[in-house]
């Protein structure tokens, strides 16, 4: 299983999403949608061994965590607008819940769940599950030299994850891994990680 946690610092936490302005008024929702697309979609198939978490910190009601489960997704397609519609449905579901209900995962559509959960608490939950935390950072160890097992990959948006959360990841001894000496788009990082792991899987067969 491959898991990704994407911290979306400015992405809207209201269902009032303007599908014609995903980058602007929706707080770079376009970037989140591209990450979801690259996390799951192959040319004529979908990756069923992937779980993707987006932790949204935009206004008006942060934080909101949306979980996408590849083995359960239905009717989701790779384009940004389609994915944004499903995110809108998840946020609408969240708005319909009281604060007690928001403590648990609630399904909005098949394979998509929503919950009140912040970035650090999500990472701690993954640690409790026995996952290994890998922070994608250009100054980390070359991914080709790292043995990746039972992974959760941490990815920041165009802003990054912030100094406080970087210190938190250092405190829990998250492994920093680098995909390139250059700064890459978040969705490109996901594609590269998949490629690295796909090749290793083929070599092991």
Swiss-Prot record:
Which residues are connected by disulfide bridges in this protein? none
The record's Gene Ontology biological-process terms are:
tRNA methylation
Residue numbers binding S-adenosyl-L-methionine: 136, 156, 179-184, 189
Q: Where in the cell is it found?
A: Cytoplasm
Record keywords, A-Z: Cytoplasm, Methyltransferase, S-adenosyl-L-methionine, Transferase, tRNA processing
In short, the EC number is: 2.1.1.257
Q: Which family does it belong to?
A: Belongs to the methyltransferase superfamily. TrmY family.
Q: How does it assemble?
A: Homodimer.
Please identify the protein, giving its name as recorded.
Answer: tRNA (pseudouridine(54)-N(1))-methyltransferase
Q: Which gene encodes it?
A: trmY
